[in-house]
Curated annotation (Swiss-Prot):
Keywords carried by this UniProt record: Antiport, Cell membrane, Glycoprotein, Membrane, Transmembrane, Transmembrane helix, Transport
Subcellular localization: Cell membrane
Segments on the Cytoplasmic face: 1-38, 264-265, 347-351, 396-460, 537-610, 671-719
Protein name: Choline transporter-like protein 5
């Protein structure tokens, strides 16, 4: 295409996307004389933060995290709480787990059976009647059985009296602790679900029950725990591993820092390390999954599906299924193919991205303080996350114990009514409904505060998202100001002022808090809409038809595209704010027009650079994830012994992997912001100047020559 055929220079396009910048001899980079922008949004933002602090204080007064850390028995007492009779009894035991199959489980959020705190779970099959027979010969049988009874229980009671008083379970069976609760110790034998090598067992009432019935009951309890916000139940694992998680995240931070420093000197070589490392790690994962899948083909029990075994306490059971490893292998193969195809089709653009990264390395070399800034972002994000988690836990555990009537037979007209366990046996309800129990149900209340707790949860989440996006926006604006100062210095480094990052950070806080809050508010609103959409999808999953599922899928896709597009525009708007000091809307408009006038350059440089850096993030997260997996599963010999007795190790593992990726993202975003700022400044440089003696370019000759070679500079600029 010759010059006359290029549509980029037509008047209509200039009219649509604004006039190009003109030469200004006084322009030397970020404007010093500024005024406050988007003041109204700044005031709203500050008021929301004040309200957030007040909410946290109120939640702290009313909440009790022990309710999340410890299970609660039928009397409302905590299991495992220090300084109480249950201090050494850390596990919750269900008298009759089979009752948890009742539909009232999800309706009342409580399994209609007595629950007590125990120090360990049963290890064998034994009924109460069998225990009484053995007790006459050996008193130790009662000593073992009484661990799972109330303190008032006596071994001489008849089975009828036992059922009436509800002092002991009629039968016990091999169990294991899961989420601090005794659940059946399931296993598979020749493709059949068993407990202790048995498929049938005695229920203590003269009947024979199937192990499958226990599986259904266990799944009912798991659904109940989901209804009570299962996320709070992992609090114990976090309490045991928080320092190991911090160590893993610190290692990720150091590793990311090392990569950033190496990018300063060996960007091209390091890219190949990223590429080979990511492809190698994924390839090893595929090979490992294939080996496991092949080995399991010889086991008959491995043909069961995940749906067949349901939700089980023994997580290793899932890794004994062919379906699990086959699914993992397919997912990894898809990821591997996508990465390889992107490397093949983007190989020429990747070369340009590496060149831009090298140029960005020079900028970081002149402004080395930018390598330290991610630590500040990490600290601020950690504060926001910790405050959100603590506030959410205290809100979720606010209230007083609420007790409700539970009738095991389900034939009591007073079922689900509130009651007082201290006087329940003397009330008319106990007489009208023999066998009814007054059990602990949940923590709640009828005060104004308790009525608005769901609203407070929404507010907590929304302000958290707003603060997270504000911290990210603040970092982007500060870094953009520092790198813009570098670019618009004619003689580098002589013309670069002292402390450019500190100056840019101070300007962003002093003058542009409102603009940054405005941009982050837009992102937070979009993210809230996405969360609400996912919540509705979860609640309405059973009532959905094909059309509604299709519409929800379309909405997810649209919101994802919208969020990423707004994030891209926001980043460039923050660059304009850092340079010119205008309000958010004006800066976003100027950035959009500038990008549209240089759309070819954007397509070649921007997203490809992010892809190169994305490989680095994957390598950091993957490396730390492998180490964390070996450590939390006790497969990595270390000087200090790792945490033991975790409910499930993937809680800290996923936290470390996800946190490592976020940390790597924070550090690599320095390079991403550097390249994007240099690119925006370069586009403005081409519009303001023509390379002559009177209007020299600010871009380095090396970068300018490379971009000309790659045909990223209009022909009129070459001449």
């Amino acid at each position: 295409m010759n010059d006359t055929e290029k549509p980029a220079d037509t008047p209509s396009e200039e009219e649509d996307f604004g006039d190009p910048r003109t030469y200004d001899p006084d322009f030397k980079g970020p404007v010093a004389n500024r005024s406050c922008t988007d003041v109204l949004c700044c005031m709203i933002f500050l008021l929301c933060i004040i309200g957030y602090i007040v909410l946290g204080l109120v939640a702290w007064v009313h909440g009790d995290p022990r309710r999340a850390a410890y299970p609660t028995d039928s009397q409302g007492h905590f299991c495992g709480q220090k300084g109480t009779p249950n201090e050494n009894k850390t596990i919750l035991f269900y008298f009759n787990l089979l009752r948890c199959t009742s539909p009232s489980v999800l309706l009342n959020l409580q399994c209609p059976t007595t629950q007590i705190c125990v120090s360990k779970c049963p290890e064998k099959f034994l009924t109460y009647v069998e225990m009484q027979l053995l007790y006459t010969k050996d008193k130790s049988y009662w000593e073992d059985y009484r661990q799972f009874c109330k303190t008032t229980a006596k071994p001489v009671k008849s089975l009828t009296q036992l059922l009436l008083d509800d002092d002991c379970p009629t039968a016990i069976f091999p169990s294991k602790p899961f989420l601090q609760r005794c659940f059946p110790d399931f296993s598979t034998k020749n493709g059949t679900l068993t407990i202790g090598s048995k498929m049938m067992f005695q229920d203590g009432n003269g009947g024979t029950r199937s192990v499958v019935e226990l599986g259904i009951a266990a799944n009912g309890i798991n659904k109940l725990l989901d209804a009570k916000s299962l996320g709070l139940k992992v609090f114990e694992d976090y309490a045991r591993t928080w320092y190991w998680i911090l160590i893993g995240l610190t290692i990720a931070m150091v590793l990311s820092w090392i990569f950033l420093i190496l990018l300063r000197f060996i960007a091209g070589c390091l890219f190949w390390v990223f590429m080979i490392g990511v492809i190698g790690i994924i390839g090893y994962g595929i090979w490992h999954c294939y080996q496991q899948y092949t080995n399991l083909q010889e086991r008959p029990s491995s043909v069961l599906t995940i749906y067949d075994i349901g939700i089980q306490t023994n997580i290793s059971m899932y890794f004994e299924l062919q379906q699990t490893w086959f699914t993992f292998m397919i997912i990894l193969c898809i990821i591997e193919v996508i990465v390889i195809l992107m490397l093949i089709f983007l190989r020429n653009r990747i070369r340009v991205a590496i060149i831009l990264l090298k140029e960005g390395s020079k900028a970081i070399g002149y402004v080395p303080s930018t390598l330290v800034y991610p630590a500040l972002t990490f600290i601020l994000l950690s504060i926001c996350i910790c405050y959100w988690v603590v506030t959410a836990v205290f809100l979720a555990t606010s209230g007083v114990p609420v007790y409700k009537v539970i009738a095991p037979g389900g034939h009591c007209i007073h079922e689900n009514q509130t009651c007082d366990p201290e006087i329940f046996n003397t009330t008319e309800i106990a007489k009208a409904c023999p066998g009814a129990l007054c059990n602990f149900a949940f923590y709640g209340g009828k005060s104004l505060y308790h009525q608005y707790i769901p609203t407070f949860h929404v507010y907590n989440l929304f302000v958290f998202l707003w603060l997270i996006n504000f911290v990210i926006a603040l970092g982007q604006c500060a870094l953009a100001g520092a790198f813009a100062t570098y670019y618009w210095a004619m003689k580098k480094p002589d013309d670069i002022p002292r402390y450019p990052l500190f100056t840019a950070f101070g300007r962003a806080i002093r003058y542009h808090t409102g603009s940054l809050a405005f941009g982050s508010l837009i992102i937070a609103l979009i993210q809230m809409f996405k969360i609400v959409l996912e919540y509705l999808d979860h609640r309405l999953k059973r009532t959905q038809n094909t059309l509604s599922k299709f519409l929800q899928c379309c909405l997810r896709c649209c919101f994802w595209c919208l969020e990423n597009a707004i994030k891209f525009l926001n980043r460039n708007a923050y660059i304009m704010i850092a340079i010119y000091g205008r309000n958010f809307c004006r800066s976003a408009k100027d950035a959009f027009n500038l990008l549209m006038r240089n759309v070819l350059k954007v397509a070649v440089t921007d997203e490809v650079t992010y892809f190169v850096l994305f490989l680095g993030k994957l390598l950091v997260a993957g490396s730390i994830g492998v180490l964390a997996f070996l450590f939390f599963t006790q497969r990595l010999p270390v000087i200090a012994q790792g945490p033991a007795s975790l409910n499930y190790y993937w809680v800290p593992l996923l936290t470390v992997i996800f946190g490592s990726y976020l940390i790597a993202h924070g550090f690599f975003s320095v390079y991403a912001m550097c390249v994007e700022t240099i690119f925006i400044c370069f586009c403005e440089d081409l519009e303001r100047n023509d390379g002559s003696t009177e209007k020299p370019y600010f871009v380095t000759p090396n970068l300018h020559g490379i971009l000309i070679k790659k045909q990223l500079v209009p022909q009129k600029q070459k001449e």
